[in-house]
Amino acid sequence: MSTPDNRSVNFFSLFRRGQHYAKTWPMEKRLAPVFVENRVIRMTRYAIRFMPPVAVFTLCWQIALGGQLGPAVATALFALSLPMQGLWWLGKRSLTPLPPSILNWFYEVRGKLQEAGQALAPVEGKPDYQALADTLKRAFKQLDKTFLDDL
């Protein structure tokens, strides 16, 4: 994955960007074969919900059985890091510039939105996946569901 051109991003702001990207990305089944985001977002949400209880259970189980605490702590830390890994990946992905094939498709979707009378802000610099997510979300809200068939 390439890094953004002239954008300096704080490590912790990547998590916020990842959360925003996960909320913005349209979870449409028709996008799943083309983009990996549907699976990553679903798994990240699952990890946010279930990994903290798994970590607590692992620690409590080892303490209750009088087992070694070291491996239990390592397992708990790994379980707690899984949601963070997903959010970090989503944050990095949101800043990644679009490849040429998707870039053409992005401009076609924007063109369809403008033809439908939607006012769109001009694209600054090279569009990234966050801009694609914003455009797709708006397209699924404003346009007919068949707009993907024409592209």
UniProtKB/Swiss-Prot annotation:
It is a multi-pass membrane protein. It is found in: Cell inner membrane. Residues 1-45, 92-151 are cytoplasmic. Keywords: Cell inner membrane, Cell membrane, Membrane, Transmembrane, Transmembrane helix. Its main location: membrane. It comes from the Bacteria. GO terms for cellular component: plasma membrane. Residues 66-68 are periplasmic. The chain crosses the membrane at residues 46-65, 69-91. Coiled coil: none annotated. It holds the Pfam family DUF412. Belongs to the UPF0208 family. This is UPF0208 membrane protein YfbV. It comes from Salmonella typhi. The gene is yfbV.
